[in-house]
Amino acid sequence: AMLAPEPVISYPPELPVSAARDEIARAIRDHQVVIVAGATGSGKTTQLPKILLELGRGVRGRIGHTQPRRLAARTVAERIAEEIGSPLGETVGWKVRFTDEVGDKTLVKLMTDGVLLAEVQRDRMLRQYDTIIIDEAHERSLNIDFLLGYLARLLPRRPDLKLVITSATIDVDRIAKHFSGHSQHQDGHSGGDDGDGAQVPVVEVSGRTYPVEVRYRPVIDPDDPEADPDRDQT
């Protein structure tokens, strides 16, 4: 087990996800796979790792937390570290291509989905982790689709591994069906024909705290030397 100082955890009361934290924690405790659905701005990205830490996750293995973009991996790591009062790179670290700010004490590891995909090539069982969060699963990138498919097959072989998926509400049913029959209830029964064990709980977090404006970047020529490197998914 990795040793790290016990982080001090509190939840900003203005975030919609804070009101749902007991329901989320109960679902994670009782199920191997949980889906948290809600709009951008609900706080799920920053608060889920803290809920998991309170449940004792991240000790036998790290909490791996994927983001679709490199910039998000860093800024989310910074935010969580600030909220638990820990320097970045200690309890909370981040890893993207060419940058690795993860230490021996790291319990929560932010990364792009491309980084986790590369780690699958080297460690098929993902032994480094006791929990995986796939954030923004509705983005439906090739990386995310491959990871979800791979994890669905891995979970029966790693009954100790928990998977939390976040998504916009629109895509929840598709994702839940994808994992029905692949996960286990806390009592050890697998899904399939075993009734309730196959059901993946969906916790809906309603509302958003901050107004979110969606802006679309212009298409960038990949041969353009001035192209934005943040578009590289890994």
Language-model segment annotations:
Residues A1-T234:
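P-loop NTPase motor module signature
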